[in-house]
């Protein structure tokens, strides 16, 4: 295993030193492959293009992120940015590698969350675009473009994670395979407009299930804060260690989004726009308005106390689906209805 990890460091060193002009590209790719970007960009864009696909993206994101958290607790994967110090690799073969603000994530490293969660959540988008192109394009090469774009993007995300010293190549590969399999399995099974209690119980099950696993492992003598301690110890700058990279931050996000999805689907605003037909221009306005609201909400400051941070994160992502599914379309629909000229009866 040591040789495999050493080869991963060598690969990161090659990416950083042989292709330094690609640094900004890798930073952008890892940002676009971040699970938080699924909530901020891909979910709203997919929803306003297709209601079914948008809900699938959100649902698969929150379930897969929860599974990724549990997998990481059991697999205990090191991250390159601390392993090079803890293992003594530097003293044996000094590597010319350096960290970035995105390197210092505090959870275990295996499997890669960027690859697993994003790969699963983008699967319904890829399959929807593929089916559309299959009905309109006669060329076989044109029909495979969505699949090629999906694979190319995820490969780039994986390389960016190696470049940043956030993951080893085998962790990236595990995330890519697991994400694709989960996306394939879950896309046909996404619940659409179930009763509110279903989403409330899902949110509760995510919280209680992860907490039960955590305390069971803790009772058995496993210290699940080991990765937080190592990240804090070996990160070059303390300000690069962010609260929102902690394992329970993703749990609060997922449980909040599950509850928010149920609230949105059963809100009066959603009931009014559910049967309404929004034109392409209205959908574009919805997307712009949603991004204008979600952006500031995403970049709000966090409470310094860890418990308050988790509560704040839960409430923020509960509000997220309510804005995208209900409030924004309702506002656009209401203003469009007011501006429409009255129909004169003959």
From Swiss-Prot:
Side of membrane Cytoplasmic, spans: 46-54, 130-140, 187-197, 274-283, 329-346
TM helices/strands, residue ranges: 25-45, 55-75, 109-129, 141-162, 168-186, 198-218, 255-273, 284-304, 308-328
Hydrolase found in the keyword field: yes
Binding site for substrate: 79, 161
Keyword Glycoprotein: no
Alphabetical list of InterPro entries matching this protein: Glucose-6-phosphatase, P_Acid_Pase_2/haloperoxi_sf, P_Acid_Pase_2/haloperoxidase
EC number from the UniProt entry: 3.1.3.9
GO cellular component, one term: membrane
The reaction(s) this protein catalyses: D-glucose 6-phosphate + H2O = D-glucose + phosphate
Family as reported in the entry's similarity comment: Belongs to the glucose-6-phosphatase family.
Identification of the protein by name: Glucose-6-phosphatase 3
The organism of origin for this protein: Bos taurus (Bovine)
Gene label: G6PC3
């Amino acid at each position: 295993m040591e040789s495999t990890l050493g080869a991963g460091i060598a690969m990161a060193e090659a990416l950083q030193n042989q292709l330094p002009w690609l640094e900004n590209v890798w930073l952008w790719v890892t940002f676009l492959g971040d699970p938080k970007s699924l909530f901020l960009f891909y979910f709203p864009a997919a929803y306003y293009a297709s209601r079914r696909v948008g809900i699938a993206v959100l649902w698969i994101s929150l379930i897969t992120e929860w599974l990724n958290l549990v997998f990481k607790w059991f697999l205990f994967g090191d991250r390159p940015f601390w392993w090079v110090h803890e293992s003594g690799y530097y003293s044996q073969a000094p590597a010319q590698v350096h960290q970035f603000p995105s390197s210092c994530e505090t959870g275990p490293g295996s499997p890669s969350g960027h690859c697993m969660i994003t790969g699963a959540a983008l699967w319904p988008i890829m399959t929807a675009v593929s089916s559309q192109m299959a009905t309109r394009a006669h060329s076989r090469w044109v029909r495979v473009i969505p699949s090629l774009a999906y694979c190319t993007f995820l490969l780039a995300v994986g390389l960016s994670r190696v470049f940043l010293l956030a993951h080893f190549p085998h962790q990236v590969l595990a995330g890519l395979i697991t994400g694709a399999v989960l996306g394939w399995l879950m896309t046909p099974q996404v619940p659409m407009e179930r009763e509110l209690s279903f989403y409330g119980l899902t949110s509760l099950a995510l919280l209680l299930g992860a907490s039960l696993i955590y305390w069971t492992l803790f009772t058995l003598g496993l210290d699940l804060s080991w990765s937080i301690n190592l990240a804090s110890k070996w990160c070059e700058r303390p300000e690069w260690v962010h609260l929102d990279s902690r394992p329970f931050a993703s749990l609060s996000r997922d449980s909040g989004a599950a509850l928010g999805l149920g609230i949105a689907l059963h809100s009066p605003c959603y009931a009014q726009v559910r049967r309404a037909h929004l034109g392409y221009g209205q959908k574009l306005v919805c997307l712009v308005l949603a991004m204008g609201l979600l952006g500031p909400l995403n970049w709000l400051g966090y409470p310094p106390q860890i418990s308050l941070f988790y509560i704040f994160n839960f409430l923020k992502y509960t509000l997220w689906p309510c804005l995208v599914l209900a409030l924004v379309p309702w506002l656009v629909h209401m203003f469009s209805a007011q501006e429409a000229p009255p129909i004169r009866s003959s």
